[in-house]
């Protein structure tokens, strides 16, 4: 199976993640930071979606019945818990090896996720639309951020939500997300990130608005070294997440 192509696909990035595809679910491996980050982004999506739809975020399946596409799903580290919250999840990734890993893990776990080796461009071109569109830790890895975000926004139904998480382009993010995380602490494989591809909140907001959505929230995420945990915060100098809405028709 060959990897799909498209204007947002950076072949070098796809190849980099394919090389470590077998480690997606190894919580002590190259993806360990993502696993520690997962509770924060999962809660952010759940809580915002529940506020938007008037649901109880602490209910057994708070996202029940909502369609969701996880763009750049990798091995399914976020897709699976979103499906456990009741969402009807479609996971997209341009790396076929990632999709094979994701499918195998979901089948073993008994979690229903529709994984596809596709791009968001092909899904939008086919006319599919979703209640929730998720692009977490993706926009800093695509070839054309603005084009990618506009296409992702096109997948949002009227009244739906778009979520993104990425890294701000600041000197602090260079020091922490690249020098610290990749070279000093070894949390991530060297070369995982390119500082010049980091995205400021203002740049991301402009791309979202050009796609017809309105930014509803921007929240920072900070790491606490003593506890080893991440939490939502006002500080957006390094990691941050956004929620955007498409007005109801």
From Swiss-Prot:
Gene Ontology biological process terms in this record: methylation
Pathway: Cofactor biosynthesis; ubiquinone biosynthesis
A GO MF label: 3-demethylubiquinol 3-O-methyltransferase activity
Enzymatic reactions: a 3-demethylubiquinol + S-adenosyl-L-methionine = a ubiquinol + S-adenosyl-L-homocysteine + H(+); a 3-(all-trans-polyprenyl)benzene-1,2-diol + S-adenosyl-L-methionine = a 2-methoxy-6-(all-trans-polyprenyl)phenol + S-adenosyl-L-homocysteine + H(+)
UniProt-listed Pfam families: Methyltransf_23
Entry keyword Iron-sulfur: no
Known EC number: 2.1.1.222, 2.1.1.64
Keywords of the record: Methyltransferase, S-adenosyl-L-methionine, Transferase, Ubiquinone biosynthesis
Residues given in the record as S-adenosyl-L-methionine binding sites: 41, 72, 93, 136
PANTHER family: METHYLTRANSFERASE, UBIQUINONE BIOSYNTHESIS O-METHYLTRANSFERASE, MITOCHONDRIAL
Function in brief: O-methyltransferase that catalyzes the 2 O-methylation steps in the ubiquinone biosynthetic pathway.
Family of this protein: Belongs to the methyltransferase superfamily. UbiG/COQ3 family.
Name recorded for this polypeptide: Ubiquinone biosynthesis O-methyltransferase
């Amino acid at each position: 199976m060959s990897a799909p192509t498209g204007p947002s696909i950076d072949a070098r990035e796809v190849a980099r993640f394919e090389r470590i595809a077998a480690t997606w679910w190894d919580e002590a491996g190259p993806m360990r930071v993502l696993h520690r980050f997962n509770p924060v982004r999962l809660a952010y999506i759940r809580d915002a979606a529940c506020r938007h739809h008037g649901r109880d975020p602490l209910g057994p399946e708070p996202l029940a019945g909502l369609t969701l596409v996880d763009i750049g799903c990798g091995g399914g580290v976020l897709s699976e818990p979103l499906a456990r919250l009741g969402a009807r999840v479609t996971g997209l990734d341009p790396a076929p090896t990632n999709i094979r890993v994701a499918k195998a893990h979901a089948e073993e776990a008994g979690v229903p996720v529709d994984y596809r080796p596709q791009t968001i461009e092909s899904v939008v071109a086919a006319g599919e639309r979703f209640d929730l569109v998720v692009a977490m830790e993706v926009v800093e890895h695509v070839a054309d951020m603005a084009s990618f975000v506009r296409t992702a926004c096109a997948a949002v139904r009227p009244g739906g939500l778009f979520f993104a998480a990425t890294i701000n382009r600041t000197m602090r993010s260079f020091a922490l997300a690249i020098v610290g995380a990749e070279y000093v602490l070894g949390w991530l494989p060297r070369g995982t990130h390119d500082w010049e591809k980091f995205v400021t909140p203002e740049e991301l907001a402009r791309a979202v608005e050009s796609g017809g959505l309105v930014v509803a929230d921007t929240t920072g995420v900070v790491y606490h070294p003593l506890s080893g945990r991440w939490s939502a915060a006002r500080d957006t100098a390094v990691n941050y997440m956004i929620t955007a809405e498409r007005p109801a028709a």
